[in-house]
Amino acid sequence: MAQSSNMKKYILLLVVSFCFLGFQQKQTTWVAIGDSITYLNEHTNETGNRVSKGYMTRVTEQLPNIQYTNQGHNGWTAIRIATEIENLGIAKADVYSIFLGTNDWWGGKPLGSFNDYEKNTGNQTVYGSFRTIINKLRSLNDQAKIILITPMQRVDFVYINSYKNNAFGSYKDKNGQWLAQFAEAINTIGKFEKLTVVDLYNKSGMNHDNLVKFKRLKNPHTGVYQNYPYPDFIGIPFNPDTDEYPYPVEAIDMTYDGLHPSDKGYAVIADMLVKVLGK
């Protein structure tokens, strides 16, 4: 009798175990391709410890069944990623995200036209480079979900570890091109390929007026430091050799340096990604 009872308990335990395994979510692999905004997820010390965690860490906290690989390359353009695509060791994955374009804009790289994408004309343009990247990802896994992420808006950037590394924001054009055009190109590619687009430029709520609370600069007339909100700081000189860092901790809003997301900004990006990755 006791032996029969033990057997029933054993069978019940097996059934419960199989049910539990059945309800466990399948592990999903995700390769995140990008520039410094992606790279910093594993290098938060390079933010002057102003960021605690990037968007991939935040996504996997909400979706623990996802395992990510960081293919963020600091300072790289879409054109460089495309040119080096065979040397990056990109693995086969269930999901790929491509978050590029802001460095192409600042570097004056030609956006090109949709024809460059459609006709696969090569890596001389951003449009053509996206075709190269997407083709590579499809060769690795033609069933993978590919997510395109547009560049986010930016204001005046000053690198916290080297003030001479600075750039104006997307409130004006660079070499006759607007960052908004690069975002629109990515939307166009997404629509053509029927890919999911996370449109940070237009739909994240991260706009020129909330990327930083102010920029601290010397008043040109008095020489006294003053906190200038956007757009009042546009055109006021910044001397990287003599001026203090223009974005003290109190200036942090959606970014901590005018370009790279703060914890608040990374949370916005992660939440937008969770909505599409969680489907």
Q: Positions of the model-derived regions?
A:
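Bacterial Sec-dependent N-terminal signal peptides
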Residues: M1-T28
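Alpha-helical transmembrane segments and their juxtamembrane interfaces
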Residues: F18-C19, N45, V155, D209
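Serine-esterase "nucleophile elbow" of acetyl-processing enzymes
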Residues: G22-G72, E84-A93
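Alpha-helical cap/lid subdomain in secreted, periplasmic
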Residues: Q25, T57-Q62, A82-K279
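Gly/Ser/Thr-rich helix-start
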Residues: D35, N41, H73-W76, T102, ...
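Acidic/histidine-rich helix-loop elements
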Residues: L40-V51, N70-W76, P110-G122, Y225
